[in-house]
Amino acid sequence: LKGGFKVINIEDVTKSIDILSKTLQSLNIDSIFIEQNGKTEKYFYKEEQLHELRSCAKLLVAMAIGIAIDKGLSIAGEPLTLNTKVFPIIKDIANIINKSNINKIKEWTIKDLLTHTTGYETQMMSERFIQDIDKDKLVDYALNYDIPYEVGTRFAYNNVEPFILSVFFQEAFNQNLTDFINENIFKKLNVLDYKWENYGKYCPGATGLYLKHSDFHKIGQLLLNEGKYDNNQIISSNWIKEMCSMKLETPSAYKSERVLPKIGIGYFTFISRDGYIFRDGSNGQYI
C-alpha cells in the first residue's frame, strides 16, 4: 500500500492490456462507431470497405415503407397504409399449390409483415436454407411453405416478410425497392457506393445489402435523430417513432445470456429487456 492506495505492478497492467488486446483482435471486429450528443468515436476502424449488413438490411425496408406511406402512394386509388393487404397484388405472380395457406395469405397486411406475425412457425429463407433454390422461384417457395398459425397472433422471426414486402412494393408501384431506397434514402445521405443484389428480379429485403461502415452509421443516425440527417428530415419523425415502439412481446426471441435480450419488436426493430432500441444481424452486426 502507498498513501492508503494499493500499488499495482506495471508489468501486471501491461500483461492485462496485452491479453485484452489479443482477445479483441480474435473477435475479428471490423468497426465500432459510437455516437452521443453529436460526437462520434470510431474503434477498429481502418479503411472504408463494403460490409454486408445481414439482417440489419431489414431496417431499410421498414424505412422505405414509411416513406411510401407518407408520400401518399396509392394502389387502385386507395392510399397505402399499414392495413393494406398484399394478396391482391401478389396473387397473380405466385403459384400457390398449398391451398391451406391461401386464406391466411389473404389476411396479410403491411403491419403483419413488418412485425413477423404472418403465421409461420419458425425461421425460414435464411441463406443456408435457400442456397439450392432457384431465386426466381422464391416467391412460390415462401407462399407454399406451411403457415400453421393464425395471422397477427404469433411472432416468428424469418426472412420471408421483408422479401414479400419487396415483391409487393415492386409489383404495386412498378419500381424495384432498392431503387426507391436509393432515391429516397441513400442519395439524401450521400451514400454513393453500395451493393444489393436481387433475388431473381426482386430486392431481397431481408439481407444481402453491402454498405461502407460510415454509411451504415448514417442509417443509425436516422434512428437516433428521429429521421433527420444533417438537419434534413429524410423520414418523418412519426414513422421512426412507430418503427421503434413495441408492437408485441417476443418470448421466442428472448435469450437471457445476450447483451441485448429481445423482449419485443417494432417494425423490423427490437426492444431489449432494458429498453434499448436496436437492430441486429448475424455475425455481430448491430445498430
Residue ranges of model-derived segments:
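A short, well-structured edge-of-sheet supersecondary motif
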Residues: 14-47, 78, 285
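Active-site helix/loop module of the DD-peptidase/beta-lactamase fold
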Residues: 71-118, 144, 172-211
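Short, charged, amphipathic alpha-helices and their helix-cap/turn boundaries
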Residues: 34, 39, 126-151, 175-194
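Flexible glycine/proline-enriched surface loops and loop-helix/loop-strand junctions
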Residues: 46, 146-150, 162-163, 199-204
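Active-site-proximal alpha-helical segments within enzyme catalytic domains
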Residues: 164-168, 205-228, 285-287
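Active-site Gly/Thr loop motif
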Residues: 193, 241-287
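Active-site SXXK
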Residues: 38, 52-82, 165-169, 219
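Short, Lys/Arg-enriched N-terminal segments with co-localized hydrophobic residues
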Residues: 1-6
